[in-house]
UniProtKB/Swiss-Prot annotation:
Residues 1-50 are annotated as: Disordered. The modification Phosphothreonine is found at residue 42. Signal peptide: none annotated. It comes from the Eukaryota. Expressed most strongly in heart with little or no expression in other tissues. In the aorta, preferentially expressed in lesions. GO terms for biological process: angiogenesis; endothelial cell migration. InterPro entries: ATPase_NBD. This is Heat shock 70 kDa protein 12B. The modification Phosphoserine is found at residues 25, 29, 44, 46, 276. Disulfide bonds: none annotated. GO terms for molecular function: ATP binding. Keywords: ATP-binding, Nucleotide-binding, Phosphoprotein. It comes from Mus musculus (Mouse).
Length: 685
């Protein structure tokens, strides 16, 4: 067993063999200066991961919140009747002719930063504000994507409202989650005969599968701030990955609840194809309208008909096409219990419906000038929101074979503001522009040809198809024959047609659930009832720590040599916990043991490193970065619980799990057999 040098340790120094030591690296190595000394107590061979039984928290009801980029909502089911999914009440407001049961992800705060409203209420109230007054209100929309794109996400990260004012992102998300919490609890109180006891609710939050650990932790922190759960009851909150939730839900569907694009288009010409898709969507809308009337959706107690046809080892892909991102995952069916195994780490990118909105904004910049659009958004924020709403309504009617042009209303304030800024009217601007597919109609509207509208879809749709094709080319996912298109953007006939045209000829069966926009929400409820359904996941990154190894000439680089007390060490060695793309079972643990470096030490901080490569040797290698810190809180010396063992020799056994939707850690003080408060912080960088 190794001893601890006098000098305190920095970073994480784990020893899995007698050839390793916790001696610190020399000055200049990329580590923090926090004193987090530990002595390794692991055996000579690195312990193999162990699986333990999952501890299920008791609950009476599951409430899932699908927090989307463009729209959000909640649903719930009782533990006594898990197959009955109760949808939220129909929201007040809404867009005429738009079949959508969720509410826009729009938050409105007063000029003082106090919560005013959310969803349709927020959007409509902001729309009705006087233009000058609206400049002082804080209106946030489509802000979920900011968390995904932030490279240095912390608890201090800020979001910018439409008027340019900034606010802590954590508070913005907490306002939104608190809104859903209060609505859901009120509805539960009205439906349940007995009052819900504290802790009776298991909450589920959906996030994209491609989100990294800091973004997932951020959502959990926002949930704590919103009061969904306390840190002491952290297990009452689950993070569900959106394509996984969709996959869980699709397992329950019957054939009449699915639209098979492959069979709809087989053997038909273009006209027959269009009629088939349009007809199927009318049927889907009617089915959805009827289900909304009752707001209770019953799923199969077992698996649906499509799943009943599948056999052990069958593979399928889920493409979650949402407002902000496309999320791809590939699952393999395991029998006899119908559990799922992830075959390749989640992939995707920023190819959501928002990309079409950005293309429309770029089109306006080409016509009216980038400087004017920027100024209009800044000085007339409410009118800009009106314009985006008008475009959204027309975007939903776009189709690959639509014959007629689409009219988009320009707010009067846009027309007036442009005339005052440029000295001529918008019709003149359109005539002078190089955009030939957009005209000015006699009704005072932008008249877009179908070609122009479809061009706005092209970059986003192409990005989605390219990602699917890249994933299908991976050796690990060979044999996939079924593709589920889910998410709000999957309602688009443009996207459906493009995916079927590109992939249908490869023998891939493309299937769309009728309630495609609610698939993730309903699946999140089912996931909350049985989170163990996804039994094996793939680690998206390689995780580990920095250690010192006995220096071996010819094997270790000379620049990594460190001599201390006459012993030669190799510094900055990357000790791997789990490798990128490694299969990790749910409940599987990676265990390490440590002891404090100093008597009386109350806290141990251990730096975690990650990279995309599987074969990184040193924490200084390109692509390896510090991504978080493991914190262990120790009992003070002299506590009755302490058996008298010297703190410097006290063993702390930590167990980390990489097979869940979040990386989790637990720790035990071996001398007392008491739990040690342990946490991993990914937001401190």
């Amino acid at each position: 067993m190794l001893t601890v040098p006098e000098m305190g340790l920095q970073g994480l120094y784990i020893s899995s063999s007698p050839e390793r030591s916790p001696v610190p690296s020399p000055p200049g190595s990329p580590r923090t200066q926090e004193s987090c000394g530990i002595a390794p107590l692991t055996p000579s061979q690195s312990p193999k991961p162990e699986a333990r039984a999952l501890q299920q928290a008791s609950f009476s009801v599951v409430v899932a919140i699908d927090f989307g980029t463009t729209s959000s909502g909640y649903a719930f089911s009782f533990a006594s009747d898990p197959e009955a999914i109760h949808m939220m009440r129909k929201w007040e407001g809404g867009d005429p002719g738009v079949a959508h049961q969720k509410t826009p992800t729009c938050l409105l705060l007063t000029p003082e930063g106090i919560f005013h409203s959310f969803g349709y209420t927020a959007r409509d109230y902001y729309h009705d504000l006087d233009p000058e007054e609206a400049r002082d209100w804080l209106y946030f929309e489509k802000f979920k994507m900011k968390i995904h794109s932030a490279t240095d996400l912390t608890l201090k990260t800020q979001l910018e409202a439409v008027n340019g004012k900034k606010m802590l992102a954590l508070e913005v998300f907490a306002h939104a989650l608190r809104f859903f919490k209060e609505h859901a609890l009120q509805e539960l109180r009205e439906q349940s005969e007995c009052m819900l006891e504290k802790g009776a609710v298991r909450w589920v939050l959906t996030v994209p599968a491609i989100w990294k650990q800091p973004a997932k932790q951020f959502m959990r922190e926002a949930a704590y701030l919103a009061g969904l759960v306390s840190r002491e009851d952290a297990e009452k909150l689950l993070i569900a990955l959106e394509p996984e939730a969709a996959s869980v839900y699709c397992r329950k569907l019957r054939l009449h609840q699915l639209m098979d694009l492959s069979s709809r288009t087989a053997g038909r010409g273009r006209l027959g194809e269009r009629r088939s898709i349009d007809s199927s969507f009318r049927h889907a809308r009617e089915q959805l309208r009827r289900s909304r009337h009752s707001r209770t959706f019953l799923v199969e107690a077992g698996v649906g008909e499509l799943w009943a046809e599948m056999q052990e080892g069958d593979r399928y892909m889920v493409a979650d096409c949402g407002g902000g991102t496309v999320d791809l995952t590939v699952h393999q069916l395991e029998q006899p219990h119908g559990t799922l195994k992830e075959l390749y780490k989640a992939s995707g990118g920023p190819y959501g419906a928002v990309g079409v909105d950005l293309a429309f904004e770029q089109l306006l910049c080409r016509i009216f000038g980038e400087d004017f659009i920027a100024k209009f958004k800044r000085q007339r924020p409410a009118a800009w929101v009106d314009l985006t709403i008008a475009f959204e309504a027309r975007k939903r009617t776009a189709g690959p074979h639509r014959a007629g042009a689409l009219n988009i209303s320009l707010p009067f304030s846009f027309i007036d503001f442009y005339r005052k800024q440029r000295g001529h009217n918008v019709e003149t601007a359109l005539r002078r522009s190089s955009v030939n597919l957009v005209k000015w109609s006699s009704q005072g509207m932008l008249r877009m040809s179908c070609e122009a509208m479809n061009e706005l879809f092209q970059p986003t749709v192409s990005g989605i198809i390219q990602h699917i094709e890249m994933l299908l080319a991976k050796p690990e996912v060979q044999g996939v024959k079924l593709l589920f298109l889910v998410g709000g953007f999957a309602e688009s006939a443009v996207l459906q047609h493009a995916v079927q045209e590109a992939l249908g000829t490869r023998g891939l069966r493309v299937v769309v659930p009728h309630d495609v926009g609610l698939t993730i929400l309903k699946g999140a409820v089912l996931f909350g009832q049985a989170p163990g359904v996804v039994r094996v996941r793939r680690s998206p990154l390689t995780y580990g720590v920095g250690v010192l190894n006995r220096f071996v000439p010819g094997h270790h680089p000379p620049e990594k040599l460190l001599v201390r007390d006459g012993r030669r060490w190799c510094t900055d060695v990357f000790e791997r916990f789990v490798a990128a793309e490694q299969s990790v079972a749910l409940g599987e643990e990676v265990r390490r043991s440590y002891c404090p470096a100093r008597p009386g030490q109350r806290r141990v901080l251990i730096n975690l490193y990650c990279c995309a490569a599987e074969d990184a040797r040193f924490i200084t290698d390109p692509g390896v970065r510090k991504c978080g810190a493991l914190s262990l809180e120790l009992e003070p010396e002299g506590c009755p619980e302490n058996t008298g063992t010297s703190p410097s020799r006290r063993e702390i056994r930590a167990a980390m799990q990489f097979g869940d939707t979040e990386i989790k850690v637990t720790a035990v003080d071996v001398s007392t057999n008491r739990s040690v408060r342990a946490a991993i912080d990914f937001l401190s960088n």
